[in-house]
Structure formats: C-alpha cells, structure tokens
Amino acid sequence: MKTLVLVAVLGLASLYLLSYASEVQQISRDEEDFRALMASFGGIFDTEERGVDKEGCRKMFGDCWGDGDCCLHLGCKTRKLPPWTDKPYCAWDWTFGRK
C-alpha cells in the first residue's frame, strides 16, 4: 500500500514537471510570435524625439534668421514677446502633426 502511494505521488510529480516544461516552451513561442508581430508593424510603436526634424535645428526660443533654421512646428518670430530678447527667435507656429 505504501509503495502504491509512493508510485502515485512520484507519477503526479513527474506529470507536473512535464506539463510545466511544455508550458514554458509555449510561453517562449508566444513571445517570439509577439515580437514578430511587433516587427511587422514597421516601427509604428517606435519612440522618436518629438519636434526635431533635422540635425542642428534651433529649438524653442533659439536664435534664428529664417523659418528654415527652426525645428519642426517652430517658426522664426520677430515680435519681441519675451522681454529679454532683442533679436528673432524660434516659437511655435500653431501647426500640429507632421508637415
């Protein structure tokens, strides 16, 4: 009787280990499928620096000589709104989204 109980417990333990191992393999397969799915979207979910469209562009309140000097969604303003400036500066040009 004791031997039968011992064999049953060992059998259940081995079944538990086998099912756990197959579950771990299934999770790793699911992770690979998820990564492949995310890669197929072509970078939609990649983060990118907002508002910078070219190397060396002027950021908010930076000096400028024309709209081409400022970063995306910024324009060169000549009005002296900030009291500390006496020359043109880059400020928001009231646009949204991508140009």
Swiss-Prot record:
Disulfide bonds: C57-C71, C64-C76, C70-C90
Coiled-coil residue spans: none
Gene Ontology molecular function terms on file: ion channel inhibitor activity; toxin activity
Any one GO cellular component localisation term in the record: extracellular region
Cross-referenced Pfam families: Toxin_12
Subcellular location: Secreted
InterPro entries: Huwentoxin-1
SUPFAM superfamilies tied to this protein: omega toxin-like
Entry remark concerning the domains of this protein: The presence of a 'disulfide through disulfide knot' structurally defines this protein as a knottin.
UniProt function note: Ion channel inhibitor.
Homology family: Belongs to the neurotoxin 10 (Hwtx-1) family. 25 (ICK4) subfamily.
Name the record gives this protein: U11-barytoxin-Tl1a
Organism annotation: Trittame loki (Brush-footed trapdoor spider)
